[in-house]
Regions:
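Catalytic-loop region of hydrolases
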Residues: 27-85, 344
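C-terminal catalytic histidine-bearing segment of alpha/beta-hydrolase fold enzymes
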Residues: 297, 301-305, 330, 337-386
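Accessory cap/linker subdomain of secreted extracellular hydrolases
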Residues: 208-313
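Gly/Ala-rich beta-loop-alpha elbow adjacent to hydrolase catalytic centers
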Residues: 178-182, 186
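Gly/Ser-rich "nucleophile elbow"/oxyanion-hole loop immediately N-terminal to the catalytic nucleophile
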Residues: 82-89, 162-179, 197-201
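Short beta-strand/loop motif that positions the catalytic acidic residue
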Residues: 316, 321-324, 328
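Alpha/beta-hydrolase active-site loop
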Residues: 147-168
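Short beta-strand element of the alpha/beta-hydrolase
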Residues: 77, 88-100
Length: 386
């Protein structure tokens, strides 16, 4: 495991003492309102974390961010650190996970953590942060998960935090932390929070491997680069399938054969049921890439879906950390650099770190050497302001 020195935890404890009573706790919500708790049970031990003293699965009420109105119930895991609860409650890391699939059984709360994710999350727990880990709408809950739907991610994430704050000894002092799709979900949540969940107090946001779609980039462009190739699998093809499935879920009459070649169409059906690792292996084994999988109409379909992938705003009222591997091909490094530039231009306080030679996965845990001090500095500054 990768843990930080005890001194850092003592420093965090000092920040908590300084800030006790300075940040108001949330009042209990009406039992039928978004963010209200429906059920709290013990999380299956095999899906837990080594550094957690207690771990729970919660079910809570939310609203569908996909259609903007339908009531739903979503799920999240909550991890409580070891040690005595600080006065005022534990500070919170809101962990927004990377791509796992679109089928309900792919939810992180229903599966063991990968070694990478376990190492990362145990580090935050060992530093004295509680973790709220939303599954996202459609994962662990009813309906199809709409991949990279910014509002859909954000509303479910924010409601999970409201529910957790009402049920556990947590401080309304939040750090959003996300990797890959989770970085997208974290930044989307930061953007929607002032209007959708104004009582939540977000101190900072930490992003690694963050996707970005503006009016000059699109999902179509991501897959167009390999359009002429016919050999070799492309690990990004599952994402095109997920975006198609989201479109088909909300648009009647879409026919998979209009958008995918016969070679790929069978895997689109599999994409609804398989989690990401199994689907990616199948795509690679079948040698699927843009050139042999996507029909011309797919580009238009992907273009039509990109508005739902875009962030509501780039101007965030708290500092944002961006960690990028220079060898990231899953979310191209150049896309992340453009994101950092545009977010800073919008007036957000940005701290960006590039990790030479590291890819999408390798960047995540190495970035802790910079993101942990970033988070602690901002907690300290926040305590002084209040």
């Amino acid at each position: 495991m990768f843990y930080f020195p005890q001194m850092l935890r003592k420093l965090l404890t000092l920040f908590l003492i300084i800030s006790v009573g300075m940040i108001p706790l949330l009042s209990s919500a009406e039992t039928t309102s978004p963010g209200s708790l429906v059920e709290k049970t013990t999380l299956d031990a095999k899906n837990g974390l080594q550094e957690a003293a207690e771990q729970y699965l919660i079910r809570y009420r939310s609203l569908s961010g996909v259609d903007g109105k339908s009531p739903r119930e979503d799920t999240a895991a909550v991890f409580i650190p070891k040690g005595e609860t600080p006065k005022g409650g534990w500070p919170v890391v809101v962990w927004t996970h990377g791509t796992v699939g679109v089928q309900t059984t792919c939810a992180p709360s229903l599966n063991p953590h990968s070694g990478r994710d376990g190492q990362y999350l145990n580090t935050w727990l060992s530093l004295g942060f509680a973790i709220v880990a939303p599954d996202y709408a459609g994962l662990g809950s009813a309906g199809l998960h709409h991949y990279l739907n910014a509002r859909g991610e954000a509303w479910s994430v924010l409601d999970s935090v409201k529910a957790a704050l009402s049920a556990f000894p947590l401080r309304n002092q939040l750090t959003l932390v996300g990797q890959s799709q989770g970085a997208h979900a974290a930044f989307a949540s930061a953007g929607y929070q002032p209007d959708y969940a104004p009582n939540l107090h977000i101190v900072s946001t930490v992003l690694t491997g963050v996707p970005y779609f503006d009016d000059k980039t699109s999902a179509a462009a991501i897959f167009a680069g390999d359009a002429g190739g016919k050999e070799g699998g492309d690990p990004k093809i599952p994402y095109a399938m997920y975006i198609y499935l989201s479109a088909a879920d909300t648009t009647k009459g879409l026919n998979v054969d209009d958008y995918f070649t016969p070679k790929a169409a069978a895997d689109v059906s599999a994409a609804r049921e398989m989690c990401i690792d199994e689907l990616t292996k199948k795509v690679m084994d079948d040698g699927l890439n843009a050139g042999n999988s996507l029909k011309p109409a797919t580009q238009g379909l992907l273009e039509s879906q990109t508005p739902s992938l875009r962030y509501s705003t780039l101007k965030i009222a708290h500092p944002v950390f961006i960690g990028t591997g220079t060898q990231d091909i899953d979310v191209p490094t150049i896309m992340q650099r453009v994101f950092a530039r545009d977010v800073a231009k919008a007036g957000t306080s940005v701290e960006m770190h590039e990790y030479k030679g590291l890819d999408h996965t390798g960047t995540m845990n190495v970035s802790l050497r910079d993101s942990v001090p970033f988070v602690l500095r901002n907690l300290h500054a926040d305590a002084k302001k209040h």
